[in-house]
Amino acid sequence: MTHICIIFPKCLIFKMRKFYLMKLCFARLLFGLLPFLLAQSLRAQFLQSDSDDRLKQWVEYLASDALEGRLTGSQGEKMAFDFLSEKFQEWTLSPAQGDKFTQAFEFTWEILPSPEATIEWEANGDRTALNAYPISGCGEALMPGTEFLNLGFGIEDTANGHSDYPSVSDLGGKVVLIEAGSPKSDNPHADFSRWTLLERARLAAQRGAGAVLFYGGTSDDSPSKTIDPHIHAMPIPVWYCLDALPQSNEPALIWINSSLNRIKKTGHNVVADLIRNKNLPTLIVGAHYDHLGWGERGSLYRGEKAIHNGADDNASGTALMLELARFLAQTKDKRFLRFNYRFIGFSGEELGLLGSKAFVEGPAFQREGLLTMFNMDMVGRLDLQEKTLQIHGAGTSPRWATLLDSLKPIGLKIKTSESGIGPSDHTSFYLQDLPVLHFFSGTHDDYHKPSDDPHTLNYRGMTDIGNYMLRIIAHVPDVLPFSKTKAPEQGKSKFKVTLGVVPDYGWEKKGMRISGVTEGKPAALAGLQKNDVVLQLGDHPVDDIYGYMAALGKFKKGDQTTVRILREENSLTFKITFE
């Protein structure tokens, strides 16, 4: 074997050593920069600073006085859905159905006494109209010249040692007069607070009363003149008399015309599709655009009547939905081309998730092919110091936890909760077994008040939230398994027991319809299902959501009873054990 000896000049050896040292330094520098480069990738901005300006412009319009609070069914709602439709049209999105982006749904706004409705007192052949009005739970009936019975406070409460029904088994269709206040008791621990007027009227109806007329009590005892459409009407009239009842030594009769008018209104969801390929999964991005109008319902403001502009709740989420729609419609980034998108502006959220509920029950909703639903509700108040974003629904898919944590932006704190059930529109989709995420920047003192105005919002924070959402979309897998979650903790409940169901708050027929059933809870263990209508718990009739809550209050943990439900057209009874 021949050995060859090569001698390098000293200058070449020096250059080779210098090159090696430079390469080693570069490698060490690159390794040291990896965390920084990773951080920079997490700061990747899909939305730029001009997004702040667009978000501000859109919020200032949606939350302007001109739209008068965007109350569902109002002219302000129309101005808002016209605005959303114009934007979707501008970005060449397609209506989900037909040739319009709007999808209408009808709801009961209020119930009013008809012009003929009255209660009259007859004595000595003369009839005098009483200063009275129908209250929540009132049914319709015509009752000419009916005998009446004074039933005290109309309470039967053996635990507190009080009963106004000791010798009355059947009220025989009489008009029952009930004092609106509470009885005095020698027992210092006696509590009659659960005996609302509605509860007393239900008891009287069960005992055979033909009508209930409340009277007296303090000003605090006077019920609202607004008839709650969510309270199912009893089969009997229920009225309240403002003045003292007439006194007569002669026999008297009561005449009742309890005729009511249900005032219907129409709300509108705004639905737009971005279809790339019909075979791709669809990701839903939604936000409710309605608010409280002039504070007719749900306001926490106690001053003079004023417009509730709802900048954070929820012009912020609506504007961010629009910005995501604009970006996704225009992007060429392949990571976003893996999905079809459906953008939905919901109305009726403030009245009980009416719009999202109508949508998932309507023909435009097909569960097959849907990947997930992102909901933005109140995303405009990201705190400048804390920078904490709340994300609800993190337990609705086993993939969410890792994804949300790994993509968390630098400097942004993420607080997650697992439940897919909450007071916003994602709940309607979770109840259809769809993974959901609800993005929420937190509550504040301006919530449901006229002071929730555009100047209070953090528009840079909204853009940051939008970029985080886009990072999630860019990395979300094409297949996303669904997980059921436990109901959220609501703090200490006034009920001793739970059935483990989600009530349908928009149900207007008799009974309490179930929107969802929590696994492992009494209802699920007994065999109850979504869309079952609860009609009776034990001996207690359930006419509506309030009757359901009243019935729950009669039980304690460990009690066994029966629950009677209506499933489609079949009446079924199940045995149940409360926990």
Residue ranges and their predicted role:
Residues L47, D126-V168, D228-G310, R326, ...:
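Soluble metallo-hydrolase cores and metallopeptidase-like ectodomains found primarily
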Residues L47-L67, T72-P95, E120, S169-D170, ...:
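Catalytic-core environment of secreted peptidases
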Residues S49-Q75, W91, P95-F101, S219-I231, ...:
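N-terminal capping segment at the start of a domain
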Residues D65-S182, L260:
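Noncatalytic luminal/extracellular "stalk/propeptide" segments of secretory-pathway proteins
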Residues A141-L142, V238, F346-S441, N458-R460:
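Metal-dependent peptidase/peptidase-like ectodomains
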Residues A319, R326-F327, D445-Q490:
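His/Asp/Glu-rich mid-to-C-terminal helical/loop segments that flank catalytic regions of hydrolases
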Residues L480-E519, A524, K554, T562-R564, ...:
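PDZ/PDZ-like peptide-tail recognition elements
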Residues L525-I545:
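Conserved PDZ fold ligand-binding element
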